[in-house]
Regions:
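N-terminal nucleotide/polyanion-binding subdomain common to many enzyme families
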Residues: 1-78
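S-adenosyl-L-methionine/SAH cofactor-binding core of RNA-modifying enzymes
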Residues: 63-113
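Structured adenosyl-cofactor binding patch, chiefly the S-adenosyl-L-methionine
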Residues: 116
Length: 116
């Protein structure tokens, strides 16, 4: 099983996945993990991945272009991944969801940035 993340701070995952039970399972080959930097699919010199909401308001929104380009590129590398896009208003992650994901060959977790 391959777990992948698409994030603006991909280096945050390795310390957790190299330690304790997760680290032992990874070293034993139970699963593999790759983290991808969303900024690798940007085209401006500042590698911008977010922008202010067009209708106004507080906070920032993820720009769709880098996300779509990354998903297209990563999906072309091997088996098509099961994509999970985290959202504050999404479906709660529970045991049933964990069991469903465990049956997938490849899972790509798209990690946005949220205020607060």
């Amino acid at each position: 099983m391959l777990f992948e993340t698409l994030s603006v701070i991909p280096e945050v995952f390795d310390p957790y996945l190299d330690a304790s039970i997760m680290g032992r399972a990874r070293r034993a080959g139970v699963f593999d993990f790759l983290s991808h930097d969303l900024r690798d699919w940007t085209h401006d010199r500042h590698r911008t991945v977010d922008d202010a909401p067009f209708g106004g308001g507080q906070g920032m929104l993820m720009k769709p272009a880098p996300v779509f380009e990354a998903l297209d590129d990563l999906s072309s590398r091997g088996p098509r991944p099961h994509v999970v896009f985290f959202s504050p208003c999404g479906v709660p992650y529970d045991q049933r969801a964990a069991e469903r994901l465990a049956r997938e060959e490849r899972v790509l977790l798209v990690c946005g940035r949220y205020e607060g």
